[in-house]
Amino acid sequence: AIRLKEINTETAAFTLSYTIESSAGDINTFYNVNEYYRLRWTDSKVYLLDFERRMAENIGLADITVSSGALRLGIGDASDIDYASYGTDQQQYTWVTGDQQLWLYDNTNRIMTKVYTEEDDNHNCGRQDEAGIKVVHADPETGDLYFIVYGYMHSGNYEGREGVMVYHFSHEDVLLEDLVFIPFNKGFEQMRSGLEELAYMNDDGTLYLLLEDTVYAIDVNMGKMDVAYKDLNSSNCTASGDGIFVMCDGGDENAGERLKIVDLNSGKERTVEGGDWRIVPLGYAGRDLIYGLIDPQMLTEDSSGVIRTPISEVHILDENYNEVKTYQKSGDYVMRLTISDGNISMKLAKAIKNGNYTDYQDAGEDYIIRNIENDDQKIYVDKQKDSIRGQQNWLHLNTSDSFVPISQSARYLDPGYDISRKYEDTDQVEMQYYVYTKGRMDAAFATIQEAVDYGTTYAGTIMTSHKQVIWQKAGRAYIWDRILTVLTRPAVHRA
């Protein structure tokens, strides 16, 4: 399948998706390949501005093996793999997602179940890139999974529509069923940005989803959907993996007067006051909450007319809300903060007065290292190489045995009636700036300056939440003569 990603008078970007079969010895393997091209053309030349090929192995039931305690996940990008172990002292499970598939491994009985896959044997209409899977609850007693699939619905009763489908997988019955479908017509970017912040289900069967500026509470057993919190700024919200949701309260769209912290498991609420400062949540590192304080006098326009949110202080609270770290650097402001495991990276800048405006000059980066306790430290993914397939991903399962587990696929139960629920659509769209790299949405920002900084670093294209492309950065070009077909292999020279 060929998908046009962007086009204007001089440049175009598209992706080419296809499946290939590889034979090595007695092994036949299928791979899903996605190629990204970005081109610029003139009257006589075609320039290849960017190219990337990504490939992921299409793991089938016959491909499942455990070698020296590691489950083979095949060739692919390890960053696309998510996993977790759960269960009781008597029964352990591990779920893993990757390449738009969900698998469940019964560690105790050595049974591997393909719970969900986007592929449909009855269709051959090509894969859709704009889709995601997220496990929202794993029951340690029964082994059951609850998860959402969001984006383009590739098959089923809602095939061809975009939205969020809530699924339940019964481990005992090996049965997959649809619970609720929420249509969403504002685009994948808006959907993904909210669900990445909050998609969580508690033990009582209440699922919380952030869509646009509203948190919805869904009773998955009754199929009832209500509004839990509304009129939020999703850029100023965050959530922990165990159901602690943080939002700004008071203030304006840039920052709040206090943080409102809600435990979605118990319903208990508490606040963190900003005092004379404005306050914003920045994210979670494990169970540690990170937030920033902003001097209200610094919430002013820069010379481009955009209000910046320079953070003067960064604070870290542990799960008991004790302050364990404070960061500030005289003369510098934190303009962007990213969290990866226990590593906190901060982009710094100095304020420069420019007439009636305040601009910011790059002042490098700084870091905070937190020792985050990993609940799944005995379960991890690494790469190993063999003589046939080369580098592959392996999921280590806290055992040293080698064996071929029992493999099975979940049966699907059609509910037989309409399970769609309408969310509170709004004509107002919160302005966000989405940075696309290699044809995929890579990051979202509340200000254009942050988006441009990121796009400059990673050669991206910026699109607003109103579907307007406003900025592009070209990469290094490779040249074809115009008479050559773009997708052949011509002789090239570097521009």
Question: Where are the model-predicted features located?
Answer:
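Surface-exposed, charged secondary-structure patches
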Residues: 2-27, 133-141
